[in-house]
Amino acid sequence: MFPMVTEFMNYGQQTVRAARYIGQGFMITLSHANRLPVTIQYPYEKLITSERFRGRIHFEFDKCIACEVCVRVCPIDLPVVDWKLETDIRKKRLLNYSIDFGICIFCGNCVEYCPTNCLSMTEEYELSTYDRHELNYNQIALGRLPMSIIDDYTIRTIFNLPEIKS
Protein backbone atom coordinates (compact mmCIF):
# COMPACT_ATOMS: atom_id res chain seq x y z
CA MET A 1 0.00 0.00 0.00
CA PHE A 2 2.75 2.43 0.86
CA PRO A 3 4.65 2.10 -2.43
CA MET A 4 1.46 3.02 -4.27
CA VAL A 5 0.96 6.13 -2.13
CA THR A 6 4.56 7.27 -2.58
CA GLU A 7 4.32 6.76 -6.35
CA PHE A 8 1.13 8.81 -6.39
CA MET A 9 2.82 11.56 -4.34
CA ASN A 10 5.83 11.55 -6.69
CA TYR A 11 3.46 11.77 -9.65
CA GLY A 12 1.71 14.74 -8.06
CA GLN A 13 5.00 16.49 -7.31
CA GLN A 14 6.20 15.91 -10.87
CA THR A 15 2.93 17.31 -12.22
CA VAL A 16 3.23 20.44 -10.09
CA ARG A 17 6.88 20.88 -11.10
CA ALA A 18 6.02 20.49 -14.81
CA ALA A 19 3.18 23.01 -14.49
CA ARG A 20 5.55 25.46 -12.78
CA TYR A 21 8.14 25.10 -15.60
CA ILE A 22 5.47 25.60 -18.25
CA GLY A 23 4.21 28.65 -16.35
CA GLN A 24 7.72 30.12 -16.14
CA GLY A 25 8.22 29.67 -19.88
CA PHE A 26 4.84 31.24 -20.58
CA MET A 27 5.69 34.24 -18.37
CA ILE A 28 8.91 34.78 -20.33
CA THR A 29 6.88 34.66 -23.55
CA LEU A 30 4.41 37.20 -22.16
CA SER A 31 7.22 39.51 -21.01
CA HIS A 32 8.47 39.69 -24.62
CA ALA A 33 5.00 40.44 -26.00
CA ASN A 34 5.11 44.15 -25.13
CA ARG A 35 8.58 44.76 -26.62
CA LEU A 36 9.34 46.11 -30.08
CA PRO A 37 10.33 43.51 -32.67
CA VAL A 38 14.04 42.87 -33.08
CA THR A 39 13.88 41.91 -36.74
CA ILE A 40 13.07 44.14 -39.69
CA GLN A 41 11.19 43.30 -42.88
CA TYR A 42 14.31 43.47 -45.04
CA PRO A 43 13.33 44.27 -48.60
CA TYR A 44 10.85 46.91 -47.46
CA GLU A 45 12.68 48.24 -44.41
CA LYS A 46 16.40 48.94 -44.16
CA LEU A 47 18.66 50.01 -41.36
CA ILE A 48 20.69 53.19 -41.68
CA THR A 49 24.32 52.12 -41.69
CA SER A 50 26.83 53.75 -39.37
CA GLU A 51 29.37 56.30 -40.58
CA ARG A 52 32.20 53.80 -40.28
CA PHE A 53 30.40 51.08 -42.25
CA ARG A 54 32.63 49.45 -44.84
CA GLY A 55 30.52 48.80 -47.91
CA ARG A 56 31.30 48.88 -51.62
CA ILE A 57 34.37 50.91 -52.60
CA HIS A 58 33.86 54.13 -54.58
CA PHE A 59 36.67 55.14 -56.95
CA GLU A 60 37.41 58.58 -58.44
CA PHE A 61 39.37 58.08 -61.65
CA ASP A 62 40.59 61.68 -61.94
CA LYS A 63 42.28 61.70 -58.52
CA CYS A 64 44.21 58.44 -58.95
CA ILE A 65 47.95 58.80 -59.62
CA ALA A 66 48.53 55.04 -60.23
CA CYS A 67 50.92 54.74 -57.29
CA GLU A 68 49.66 51.21 -56.52
CA VAL A 69 49.72 51.75 -52.76
CA CYS A 70 46.27 50.16 -52.63
CA VAL A 71 47.63 46.97 -54.20
CA ARG A 72 50.57 46.80 -51.79
CA VAL A 73 48.49 47.24 -48.62
CA CYS A 74 45.73 44.87 -49.72
CA PRO A 75 46.11 41.55 -47.86
CA ILE A 76 45.04 39.66 -50.98
CA ASP A 77 46.58 41.96 -53.67
CA LEU A 78 43.15 42.56 -55.10
CA PRO A 79 42.97 45.91 -56.95
CA VAL A 80 44.13 45.63 -60.55
CA VAL A 81 45.85 48.84 -61.66
CA ASP A 82 46.85 49.18 -65.32
CA TRP A 83 48.94 52.23 -66.14
CA LYS A 84 51.25 53.55 -68.82
CA LEU A 85 54.36 55.63 -68.27
CA GLU A 86 54.26 58.80 -70.33
CA THR A 87 57.87 59.62 -71.08
CA ASP A 88 57.34 63.23 -72.12
CA ILE A 89 55.98 64.28 -68.70
CA ARG A 90 57.57 61.36 -66.78
CA LYS A 91 54.35 60.44 -64.99
CA LYS A 92 52.13 57.41 -64.86
CA ARG A 93 48.78 57.61 -66.62
CA LEU A 94 46.04 55.35 -65.30
CA LEU A 95 44.46 53.17 -67.98
CA ASN A 96 42.25 50.79 -66.02
CA TYR A 97 41.33 50.13 -62.39
CA SER A 98 39.20 47.22 -61.20
CA ILE A 99 38.26 45.42 -58.00
CA ASP A 100 36.61 42.00 -57.76
CA PHE A 101 34.11 42.19 -54.89
CA GLY A 102 33.69 38.42 -54.97
CA ILE A 103 37.17 38.19 -53.45
CA CYS A 104 37.37 41.49 -51.52
CA ILE A 105 37.25 41.16 -47.73
CA PHE A 106 36.26 44.83 -47.21
CA CYS A 107 39.12 45.49 -44.81
CA GLY A 108 39.42 49.13 -45.89
CA ASN A 109 43.23 49.21 -46.08
CA CYS A 110 43.16 50.54 -49.64
CA VAL A 111 40.93 53.43 -48.58
CA GLU A 112 42.98 54.21 -45.49
CA TYR A 113 46.38 54.29 -47.19
CA CYS A 114 45.43 55.97 -50.49
CA PRO A 115 47.52 59.19 -50.67
CA THR A 116 45.07 61.05 -52.93
CA ASN A 117 41.83 59.88 -51.27
CA CYS A 118 40.46 58.60 -54.57
CA LEU A 119 39.00 55.56 -52.79
CA SER A 120 36.18 55.69 -50.25
CA MET A 121 33.79 53.24 -48.65
CA THR A 122 30.09 53.63 -49.40
CA GLU A 123 27.03 52.45 -47.51
CA GLU A 124 26.09 50.01 -50.28
CA TYR A 125 25.99 46.40 -49.13
CA GLU A 126 23.64 44.76 -51.63
CA LEU A 127 26.15 43.26 -54.03
CA SER A 128 24.49 39.91 -54.69
CA THR A 129 24.34 38.66 -58.28
CA TYR A 130 23.58 35.41 -60.06
CA ASP A 131 26.97 35.35 -61.79
CA ARG A 132 30.16 35.89 -59.80
CA HIS A 133 31.83 37.55 -62.78
CA GLU A 134 29.43 40.49 -62.39
CA LEU A 135 31.17 41.32 -59.10
CA ASN A 136 34.31 42.41 -60.96
CA TYR A 137 33.83 46.20 -61.08
CA ASN A 138 35.89 48.37 -63.43
CA GLN A 139 36.56 52.09 -62.95
CA ILE A 140 33.21 53.04 -64.49
CA ALA A 141 31.20 50.80 -62.17
CA LEU A 142 33.33 51.84 -59.18
CA GLY A 143 32.75 55.50 -60.03
CA ARG A 144 28.98 55.26 -59.67
CA LEU A 145 27.72 56.46 -56.33
CA PRO A 146 25.05 54.26 -54.78
CA MET A 147 21.56 55.58 -54.20
CA SER A 148 21.28 56.56 -50.57
CA ILE A 149 18.85 54.59 -48.46
CA ILE A 150 17.51 57.85 -47.06
CA ASP A 151 16.66 59.13 -50.55
CA ASP A 152 14.83 55.96 -51.62
CA TYR A 153 11.14 56.69 -51.14
CA THR A 154 10.10 53.05 -51.73
CA ILE A 155 11.86 51.87 -48.59
CA ARG A 156 10.97 52.70 -45.01
CA THR A 157 14.19 53.39 -43.15
CA ILE A 158 14.69 52.40 -39.54
CA PHE A 159 16.56 55.13 -37.68
CA ASN A 160 16.40 54.01 -34.07
CA LEU A 161 16.44 50.39 -33.09
CA PRO A 162 15.53 49.49 -29.54
CA GLU A 163 18.66 48.75 -27.58
CA ILE A 164 19.01 45.24 -26.25
CA LYS A 165 19.24 45.13 -22.49
CA SER A 166 21.60 42.50 -21.16
Swiss-Prot record:
Sites where the protein binds [4Fe-4S] cluster 1: C64, C67, C70, C114
UniProt entry keywords in alphabetical sequence: 4Fe-4S, Chloroplast, Iron, Iron-sulfur, Membrane, Metal-binding, NAD, NADP, Plastid, Plastoquinone, Quinone, Repeat, Thylakoid, Translocase
Record-listed [4Fe-4S] cluster 2 binding positions: C74, C104, C107, C110
Pfam families membership: Fer4
InterPro entries: 4Fe4S_Fe-S-bd, 4Fe4S_Fe_S_CS, NADH_quinone_OxRdtase_chainI, NDHI
Top-rank taxon, per record: Eukaryota
Cellular compartments annotated: Plastid, Chloroplast thylakoid membrane
EC number: 7.1.1.-
Membrane topology: Peripheral membrane protein
GO terms of biological process kind: photosynthesis, light reaction
Cofactor(s) needed for function: [4Fe-4S] cluster
Membrane-spanning parts: none
Cross-referenced PROSITE patterns: 4FE4S_FER_1, 4FE4S_FER_2
Chief location of this protein within or outside the cell: plastid
Family membership noted in the UniProt record: Belongs to the complex I 23 kDa subunit family.
Official protein name in the record: NAD(P)H-quinone oxidoreductase subunit I, chloroplastic
Annotated organism of origin: Polymnia canadensis (White-flowered leaf-cup)
Species lineage: Eukaryota, Viridiplantae, Streptophyta, Embryophyta, Tracheophyta
Gene transcribed to yield this protein: ndhI
